[in-house]
């Protein structure tokens, strides 16, 4: 299986690539790009993990999840209590379970200069 990780900070992408190389992990691709809309070229995915909060579950990311796939996503407004949700896509829609309260940075569009 293959893992794709999208990073909007060049320094973090470079660090991740070096660490994976040092650990001899070869099934992970680190992409330096805007991940706001997911990664449609390799969709659909078995699993999706968002590591930044969204105000609501993005339909364009759900569309990249296979039926039977699982997404972990922090949902909520900035600087407020957010919920970490487990979303399972099934034939009829979504099965959503709240896992815990969390606080994540808000998801942003674009690349950072650093």
Segments and roles (model prediction):
Residues 83-114:
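Core SAM-dependent methyltransferase catalytic element
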Residues 1-81, 85-94:
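Conserved nucleotide-cofactor-binding alpha/beta core module
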């Amino acid at each position: 299986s293959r893992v794709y990780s999208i990073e909007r900070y060049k320094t973090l992408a470079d660090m991740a690539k070096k660490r994976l190389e040092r650990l001899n992990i070869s099934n992970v691709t680190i992409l330096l790009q805007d991940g706001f809309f997911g990664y449609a070229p390799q969709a659909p995915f078995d699993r999706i993990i968002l590591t930044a909060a969204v105000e609501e579950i993005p339909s364009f990311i759900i569309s990249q999840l296979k039926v039977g796939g699982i997404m972990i996503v922090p949902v909520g407004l900035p600087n407020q209590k957010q919920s970490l949700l487990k979303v399972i896509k099934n034939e009829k829609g979504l099965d959503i379970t709240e896992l815990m309260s969390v606080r994540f940075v808000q998801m942003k569009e674009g690349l950072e200069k650093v």
